[in-house]
């Protein structure tokens, strides 16, 4: 994770994300850099617009949270009423079954 943080730090200060700069940031943080991981990260970030990726990653969270709450509340009240009706009907059915079971025991 520290490799990604180092890349984001370099990006935020406007420095080029390359092997040399990543090594310097990691060493300054007390991390012993691994060449393979640094090369893989630099290759993976090549051609990637980091600002755009950050914006896309943050955007759905804010957008998805607001609309999801409104429909859930409206539908939740209707569902609760339907569930209460269904429970009452089930209780009535159970009561009738218990009554019939009691009668069958009398005439068994």
Curated annotation (Swiss-Prot):
GO cellular component: ribonucleoprotein complex; ribosome
GO biological process, one term: translational elongation
Record keywords: Ribonucleoprotein, Ribosomal protein
Matching Pfam families: Ribosomal_60s
Signal peptide: none
Stored InterPro entries: P1/P2_N_sf, Ribosomal_P1/P2, Ribosomal_P1_arc
Keyword Ribonucleoprotein among record annotations: yes
Composition-biased stretches (Acidic residues): 84-99
A molecular function GO annotation: structural constituent of ribosome
Domain of life of the organism encoding this protein: Archaea
Region entry Disordered, spans: 67-108
Keyword Ribosomal protein on entry: yes
Purpose: Forms part of the ribosomal stalk, playing a central role in the interaction of the ribosome with GTP-bound translation factors. The stalk complex of P.horikoshii binds to E.coli large subunits and confers on them the ability to interact with eukaryotic elongation factors. Each succesive P1 dimer bound along the P0 spine increases the GTPase activity of elongation factors and increases translation by reconsituted ribosomes.
Family annotation (HAMAP family): Ribosomal_L12_arch
Homology family: Belongs to the eukaryotic ribosomal protein P1/P2 family.
UniProt subunit comment: Part of the 50S ribosomal subunit. Homodimer, it forms part of the ribosomal stalk which helps the ribosome interact with GTP-bound translation factors. Forms a heptameric uL10/P0(P1)2(P1)2(P1)2 complex, where uL10/P0 forms an elongated spine to which the P1 dimers bind in a sequential fashion.
Name of the protein in its database record: Large ribosomal subunit protein P1
Organism: Pyrococcus horikoshii (strain ATCC 700860 / DSM 12428 / JCM 9974 / NBRC 100139 / OT-3)
Gene: rpl12
């Amino acid at each position: 994770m520290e490799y990604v943080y180092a890349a984001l730090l370099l990006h935020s200060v406007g420095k080029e994300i390359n092997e040399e700069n990543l090594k310097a940031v990691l060493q300054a943080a007390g991390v012993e850099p691994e060449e393979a991981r640094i090369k893989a990260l630099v290759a993976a970030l090549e051609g990637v617009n980091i600002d755009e990726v950050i914006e896309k990653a943050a955007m759905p969270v804010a957008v998805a949270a607001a609309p999801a709450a409104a429909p859930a509340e409206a539908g939740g009240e209707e569902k609760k009423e339907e569930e209460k009706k269904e429970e009452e009907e089930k209780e009535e059915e159970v009561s009738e079954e218990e009554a019939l079971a009691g009668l069958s025991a009398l005439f068994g």
